[in-house]
């Protein structure tokens, strides 16, 4: 093994957390060999973990999914029943393509172009490879003034760059016919940047890898990872298109070259334009996101066009539960969304009794918000949610409707307590808009953990109306308690109140009146009698 060339199959570069909570750096081969001993990937960013997970999945697809499966769930179940991954088959594949996994190579460097050169002969600092956006929940930018990074770090950020790189003008590459004036003009962000990425997570990394390995799909022999393709050049590949998830997992949106210094670290880089992707037509290929019907794109192409569904970082994941777990497409009342295939696959496994029907599916989502023209980083965020596996099934329409209604009632209750906060501020002579926003945020915060717990406990096989009624009562009590706190803190000015004239109409705002409005709205939004809990079939 030539360590100076750094083969990612056998050299450690992937950050993981073991079952005891310790972080380790492992090679690709060791990860597959010991996946059952690792809890999860533990890279610098959730988006980095997502990008690396997809590379690992590309390997597994090529090992186990070389042709259509006659009995997809049964064949998958045979692998699931093992305590570890079938390492012999995996190693055989890795050894076959070993020469394509050298990070530094004169002819075929991993995910790079060996002779990539800028038209001006210059290179860029290596920190261009690393996002300069705030980490969710953190105070500092990811990017620092790196003079160099280790090959292991470079390998991680190389995978991230292909998946998520920002758009904007790139360095013009010699041999790229699209270059004008030494510049590569924008061709869009990396493919994963379009996605509200979804990962089904297991109790360890072995389970996570398998749960995201969808055997029930049409196999296309052209669907191969980039390391099985001819070595990349600086030029755009002619007529390049994805033929399945494997190609998308390793799509070369950029042409990249890492430059080593005398110590063997990476100190300079080139990032140039690669292959653009037809982002409007990937719903039959991409398996790790949900989909939304795009009216503008459908009008443009004269057919239904589904675009990757993205997540709103300002909202908790459960507030969009109707899009995350849509009802069947055959239901014309809700054909605006299509389910995420990896979530649906878990439901298929449960319906075929490969997984328990009581299994709680846990998902982790990853999203990126870009700046203007997608030419800068804004935010990278993630969220988690757990629910009964059967909620992803097309057969669970009635249960889904109950969950939708539960989320809607929670959201409306938060909005109602927000209006209470605004009305109390008006009564006290304060800023109603600011107070309303703060109270609404408090409402959502108060309901967040309880809703997640309720959803994890929700069972489609039990009485959904009883479960909805219990949740509605819980929301009522939590929001009523929050309202009591707001009223107690409103101050004497609010109790006295004031008259406010708007549009030639005068209304008296006071604590007492605000409470009356609040109570009326809350009772209307949260019906608690048994007759009003019923969900239509």
Indicate where each model-derived feature is located.
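Short functional micro-motifs and their immediate structural scaffolds
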Residues: 155-158
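Extended alpha-helical scaffolding segments
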Residues: 1-136, 160, 165-537
């Amino acid at each position: 093994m030539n360590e100076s060339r750094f083969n990612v199959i056998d050299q450690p570069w992937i950050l993981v957390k073991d079952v005891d909570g310790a972080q380790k750096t492992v090679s690709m081969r060791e990860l597959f060999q010991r996946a059952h001993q690792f809890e999860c990937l533990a890279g610098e960013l959730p988006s980095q973990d997502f990008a690396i997970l997809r590379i690992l999945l590309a390997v597994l697809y090529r090992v186990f999914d070389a042709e259509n499966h006659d009995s997809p769930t049964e064949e998958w179940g045979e692998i699931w029943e093992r305590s570890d991954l079938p390492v012999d088959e995996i190693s055989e594949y890795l050894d076959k393509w070993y020469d394509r996994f050298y990070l530094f190579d004169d002819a075929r460097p991993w995910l790079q172009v060996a002779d990539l050169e800028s038209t001006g002969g210059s290179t860029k600092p290596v920190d261009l490879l690393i996002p300069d956006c705030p980490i969710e929940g953190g105070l500092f930018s990811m990017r620092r003034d790196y003079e160099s990074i280790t090959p292991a770090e470079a390998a991680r950020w190389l995978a991230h760059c292909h998946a998520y790189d920002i758009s904007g003008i790139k360095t013009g590459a010699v041999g790229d016919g699209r270059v004008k004036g030494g510049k590569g003009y924008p061709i869009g962000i990396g493919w994963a940047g379009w996605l509200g990425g979804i990962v089904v997570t297991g109790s360890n990394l072995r389970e996570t890898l398998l749960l995201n390995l969808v055997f029930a799909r049409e196999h296309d022999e052209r669907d191969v990872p980039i390391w099985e393709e001819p070595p990349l050049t600086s030029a755009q590949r002619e007529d390049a298109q994805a033929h399945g998830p494997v190609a998308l997992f390793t799509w070369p949106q950029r042409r990249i070259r890492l430059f080593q210094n005398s110590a063997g670290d990476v100190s300079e880089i080139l990032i140039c334009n690669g292959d653009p992707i037809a982002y409007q037509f990937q719903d039959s290929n991409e398996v790790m996101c949900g989909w939304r019907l795009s009216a503008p794109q459908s009008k443009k192409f004269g057919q239904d066009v589904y675009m990757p569904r993205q997540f709103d970082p300002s909202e908790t994941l459960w507030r969009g539960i109707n899009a995350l777990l849509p009802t069947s497409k055959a239901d014309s009342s809700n054909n605006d969304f299509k389910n995420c295939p990896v979530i649906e696959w878990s439901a298929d496994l449960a319906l075929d009794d490969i997984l328990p029907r009581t299994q709680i599916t846990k998902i982790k989502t990853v999203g990126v918000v870009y700046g203007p023209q997608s030419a800068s980083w804004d935010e990278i965020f993630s969220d988690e949610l757990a629910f009964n596996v059967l909620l992803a099934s097309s057969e669970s329409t009635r249960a889904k409707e109950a969950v939708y209604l539960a989320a809607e009632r929670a959201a409306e209750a938060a909005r109602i307590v927000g209006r209470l906060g605004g009305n109390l501020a008006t009564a006290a002579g304060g800023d109603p808009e600011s107070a309303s926003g703060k109270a609404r945020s408090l409402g959502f915060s108060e309901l967040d953990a309880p809703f997640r717990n309720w959803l994890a406990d929700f069972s489609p096989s039990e009485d959904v109306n009883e479960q909805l009624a219990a949740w509605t009562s819980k929301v009522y009590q939590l929001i009523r308690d929050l309202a009591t706190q707001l009223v107690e803190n409103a101050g004497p000015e609010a109790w006295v109140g004031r008259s406010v004239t708007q549009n030639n109409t005068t209304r008296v705002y006071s604590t007492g009146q605000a409470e009356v409005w609040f109570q009326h709205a809350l009772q209307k939004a949260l019906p608690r009698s048994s007759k009003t809990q019923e969900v239509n079939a």
